[in-house]
Amino acid sequence: MFVPVLVLLAACGASRIEPGNVAVGTWGGVEAGLLVRADGAHAHIGCTYGDVTGPIPFDADGRFDVAAQWNVSAFPIDRGVFHDARMSGRLGGRSLTFSARLGDTGQVLGPVMVTLGREPTMANCPICRDPKARARATAPRSRDAAASAGTP
């Protein structure tokens, strides 16, 4: 008798949403930020940051997983070395939890939680507001490309 009730409660608790793209805007949290544009996104986890090209699509469970380029050596001196990475997470209403996993080392950054319309609160590292203002080449350099060019 209890099993059907539990199954019914579990089904009612499952929150499915219409698949789509993460909303354009500023998503902020403690030591985290996600600046979403129609053509991509810029994310910060602590003193690291990454870029996503294109929209961030999510499924009916709010889950997403997209390719990114991630810089883990941005502070105190940004050397402009980017790693291929995956940014993944889950959207839940106006909040979103995400992390980044570097492809070459497997290092995981996060997870962090951000909220749409909230300003990021960064303690030591400022968030990059304008991608064009960042002092780096427009094409991300991978760690392997930097090593072959003789850059530490």
What are these regions (language model features)?
Residues 149-152:
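Short, solvent-exposed mixed-charge patches
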